[in-house]
A protein has these predicted regions:
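Contiguous alpha-helical scaffold segments within structured protein domains
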Residues: 1-6, 10-13, 87-184
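Conserved hydrophobic/aromatic pocket- or pore-lining residues that grip, position, or stack substrates
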Residues: 23, 79, 114
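Short, intrinsically disordered, charge-balanced linker/junction segments flanking boundaries
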Residues: 186-191
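An anion-binding catalytic pocket shared by soluble metabolic enzymes
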Residues: 32, 37-111, 144
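Short coil/turn segments at secondary-structure boundaries
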Residues: 26-31, 61-64, 131, 158, ...
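Short, well-ordered alpha-helical packing segments
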Residues: 16, 47-51, 117
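Terminal domain-start leader segments
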Residues: 2-43
Length: 191
């Protein structure tokens, strides 16, 4: 269920308080639902516009009887595999285009990169990290590193996927503490 703008601001303030507290939580990524009347939006036109404005993103349109319609554009590749070579990205740190990168954004990006490489280390022979690079995301920019690794056992690909998801870029860090906070406070089910 969608929450009001003021409730979302309150959630942001609560999240900041949690991060400043003695909690071990290092990062929490909150979100909210924006509900639109189905008559307010042309899905095919929106889908085309997302492709046009975010050419490097994974653009999706999904409909589920219970959950309704979800449409969006994600710049984050979770996992790709070909001949046991797996690829993913570490995407974190966001700023307005006109701003300069700060240590805060580089730290956020490194937390995600470290998490991904540590997770992959148990499944792979080697890991290569290229980046971070600044990437365009509409009105914003993100820091992105490309990560590739040689999978030891192709039968473990689904295990790798389960271990990676959700990355700290979409949930937080440590995963269990961030997930608990999100479940208790966001007011909707992200799955």
């Amino acid at each position: 269920e969608a929450i009001s703008y003021n409730d979302y601001i309150n959630l942001i303030e609560k999240t900041v308080e949690e991060l400043k507290s003695d909690s071990d939580t290092q990062k929490i990524v909150i979100s909210r639902i924006k509900e639109l009347d189905k008559h307010d939006i042309d899905l095919s036109e929106t889908f085309k516009n997302l492709h046009q404005h975010y050419p490097n993103a994974y653009v999706y349109l999904r409909y589920d009887v219970e959950e309704g319609c979800w449409i969006g554009a994600s710049p984050e590749l979770l996992l790709k595999e070909e001949n046991q070579l797996i690829q993913t990205v570490s995407l974190a740190g966001t700023k307005a285009k006109e701003d300069d990168w700060t240590d805060k954004e580089y730290h956020e990006q490194q937390v995600v990169t470290d998490y991904i490489t540590a997770t992959l280390s148990g499944f792979t022979n080697y890991i290569d990290v290229d980046g971070p690079f600044s990437v365009n995301a509409g009105f914003f920019e993100h820091l992105k590193s490309f990560i590739s690794a040689q999978l030891i056992d192709k039968d473990k690909l689904y295990d790798v996927l389960k271990a990676l998801h959700p990355t700290p870029a979409v949930g937080g860090m440590p995963k269990d503490l961030a997930k608990d906070f999100i479940i208790k406070n966001e007011g909707y089910n992200r799955t």
